[in-house]
Amino acid sequence: MSQRFTLMTAALLAAALVSVDALAATASAGARSYEDLALNGAGDRVAALESVNPPDAAKRAHASVVVRDAGSGKVLATYDPCPHCLYNYPSWSPDGKALAFIGNDSHSGNAMLYLASDGKVRAISTFKGVANTARWAPDGQRLALLATVGARKSTGATQAGAPQVGEIGTDEDEQRIALVPRSGGALKLLSPEDTFVYEYDWMPDGSGWVVTSAKGNGDNNWWVATLGHVDAGSGALRVLAAPKTQLNMPRVSGDGKTVAYIGGLMSDFGSVGGDIFTVPLAGGEPVDLTPGFNGSFNGLDWRNGQLLATAQMGGEQAVLAVDAASGSRRVLWSQQAGVGTACEGCVSFSADGTRAATALESFEHAPHIVAGRLPELAAITHDNDALPAHVAVRSISWTNDQFTVQGWLLSPLKVDAGKTYPMAVIVHGGPAAAVAPGYVTPGKSTRGLIHDLTAKGYFVFLPNPRGSYGQGLTFSSANQRDLGGGDWRDILAGIDAVEKVAPVDDHRLALMGHSYGGFMTMWGVTHSQRFKAAVAGAGIANWISYYGQNGIDQWMIPYFGHSAYDDPAVYRAASPIESIKAAKTPTLITVGERDVECPPAQSVEFWHGLKAMGTPVSLVIYPGEGHSFQQPASRADERARTLAWLDRYVK
């Protein structure tokens, strides 16, 4: 058979590593990353999770908690008490003398809350399960955290799902707020046992928390989460507001009277973009504080009675001061750079709001920590200064319908005059997301693929079509009830715009993407003959069957307006499988075996349709993987297959 339906074994995955990454892994060894930054209250020390890419591509980088002087970048302390742990979100005590962080140990199944000070670290609480987001009480004598006791899977819909055996839907993981005294001890679970808490913020007097939460399955119900208050004494939950759109980052004002949050149409928890809304702590209707803002807020904090926010504005990341009464705003700092994994809100601020720290990177420059008094942020780390640029980049803008659309064009460093080049179009996930600058380096997931493509002579186009972040709520919600419509036209118009300014051969185009990008790839090959090859990762072929198969069906209601049972026509109209007879493009399909968000059944259905049409197709299902591949071997194999597929059908 010319088509392959392959279930990869661990041995085959390991063997596949030699194809692409033997040289690439060596080239990227030593690149340092900085994540989950936390600036202390005084603004003179910064903690971060730091890791160095290992020379062996089959191994995952292990991060340590590193404390640096925020002026010089000098390392003051390094903490790594658990060799198998994934740490998250270091948090400074109010007096700045201690640092708390969580370690989740995949080997033992334990979660530990660690306390570090004066160069020493100890676990002050341990339990079976997973945890994240430790935060100090205002008095510095207690710590709160989000705990899932006896968790069946890692938290989040992008993680591999729990085995679906036995009676389904009767035993859900619930993430709850828990308290631990500074001196240590067992968890005290506070929030209701039938409710999944996504985010929280301490009340200024330590009496409780504002939360975003939903009853039942946490993976599925974030899209209908409400804003609430949990009492630290009784654990009682009181709903403050139930907005019709999604909400992130609840933050309580210093006087305890107002809650601010980021709200808007969002397709994935953790992918944040919207306007700033406020609501009284007593409850009431949320008010959009920033209507008409031509960007997407993605971070939020109160400082001295005003809001400090981060936002994506077109191709730039910015820090803004926002008046909590009028909504007036001024840009304090902006740069064409990416900060997406730097910290929970992208930028961390000192207690008085005058100083900040974040980790910046661009397509051409590796990450580095910048810190200082706003707006003058200066580099304090130089570990990656010697790493070279692997691509050339330009921001591309074009108009389609009533919108101005932005994207990125990456190209080989050396382009010969008079020569034309193939181009890969990579559609981001989401749809509520956006491509922001990130260092292109060998061996790093999508960025590693971009490196390998440009090294082979490809141009790479990364469009941000309607539905993406960066241009306000009107733009990010313009794909409602129109997936595969205006967004697809934006992408095609973007390709046309690129071909007017770059030496791209229209007869050597490839289309690819993962998640929403996988759906758009399936849509593209059933609605266009323009592409010579396609790679659809974790795509959606049939929205009707998908509605009943996935573990997050609540996300579709905001986009389609109704359930698939109430309005099947709009779901059918957006389904690539409805046009499968038009599909002629050779397509590689990849998906994780335990993908909760886009189950492998969708990929199998599309593979089956292409096979029936006689279209060249290959399907690879990666064992044990979820929506976001975690194993380096899986990522390397997917990348190797992608390059081989394009070499076969495009070059």
Where are these regions (language model features)?
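Beta-strand-rich domains and repeat architectures in extracellular enzymes and scaffolds
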Residues: S28-A63
